[in-house]
């Protein structure tokens, strides 16, 4: 609870700041916050009165008029923040409650294996972000690799790869090698370039809307590359790294750039460091989103996710 109050709320306010009006004239930012020291009622009184055991949350807000340069700052009451009791419970409307984590919906990556009628294994995985579109991957009996973006109709994985900027078959093979599932996906993919891939994916995500490359680019960029719209969060990144066994893939490599913890913002290992087993474990546990390591060709570094 204390960690969330110190760090989590700060990140929430940082994510929503700054709020601007339609014309961009007024800009509202949250510059600080604090809690009252004591709750209005004790735990016993909250149960007797059927109220929530909570402390007032007060936020310092700053309003900036970008046209006149005028800045106003004041403290506002944001609401009552439920407070955990000494026994780890919460009192909500007089009833004592506990929080149960919902693992199925927790951010991260999930795998599944099914079988077709002939007993062939069909693989699937789902990437669930803290906020943003789900990505659901699956293979079929013909080894075609499909993806669903935000619960829409499935498309060959190569359509998504093209829409992310790797447009031609040659570029895709250069990146992934002659992976059989990628080659099989080409047979179901009518697109042959970045723009065609963009429009094909756009048709599935926004069926019925006029096709335009600009609109498709804007949609893909906002869906996957805007931190306010797509975020795995620290928990999701930690679980993603663990499931993909990041530590096994980076052990023995030499860092081409500093490894920075997403949990604390601190440098876990400096550029030029050879990654030992112990250091690889530390990097994985710190939810580092990616690493740049030195490649066999000295002029080319490799990004490991």
Task: Locate the predicted segments by residue.
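N-terminal non-catalytic structural scaffold regions of very large proteins
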Residues: 1-305
């Amino acid at each position: 609870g204390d960690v969330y109050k110190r760090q989590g709320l700060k990140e929430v306010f940082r994510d929503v700041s700054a709020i601007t009006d339609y014309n961009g004239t007024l800009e509202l930012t949250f510059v600080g916050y604090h809690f009252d020291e004591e709750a209005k009622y004790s735990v016993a009184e909250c149960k007797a009165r059927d109220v929530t055991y909570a402390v007032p949350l007060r936020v310092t807000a700053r309003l900036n008029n970008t046209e006149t340069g005028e800045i106003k700052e004041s403290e506002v009451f944001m609401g009552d923040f439920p407070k955990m009791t000494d026994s780890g419970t919460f009192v909500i409307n007089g009833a004592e409650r506990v929080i149960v984590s919902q693992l199925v919906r927790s951010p991260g990556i999930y795998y599944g294996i099914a079988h077709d009628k002939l007993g062939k294994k069909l693989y699937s995985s789902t990437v669930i972000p803290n906020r943003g579109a789900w990505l659901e991957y699956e293979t079929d009996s013909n080894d075609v690799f499909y993806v669903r973006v935000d619960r829409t109709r499935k498309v060959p994985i190569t359509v998504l790869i093209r829409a992310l900027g790797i447009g031609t078959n040659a570029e895709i093979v250069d990146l992934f090698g002659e992976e059989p599932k990628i080659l099989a996906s080409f047979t179901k993919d009518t697109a042959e370039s970045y723009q065609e891939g963009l429009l094909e994916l756009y048709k599935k995500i926004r069926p019925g809307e006029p096709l335009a490359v600009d609109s498709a680019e804007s949609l893909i960029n906002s869906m996957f590359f805007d931190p306010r719209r797509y975020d795995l969060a620290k928990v999701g990144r930690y679980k993603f790294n663990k499931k993909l066994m990041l530590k096994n893939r980076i052990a023995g490599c030499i860092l081409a750039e500093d490894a920075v913890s997403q949990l604390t913002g601190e440098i876990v290992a400096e550029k030029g460091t050879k990654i030992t087993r112990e250091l690889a474990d530390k990097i994985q546990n710190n939810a580092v989103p990616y690493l740049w390591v030195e490649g066999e060709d000295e002029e080319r570094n490799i990004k490991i996710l």
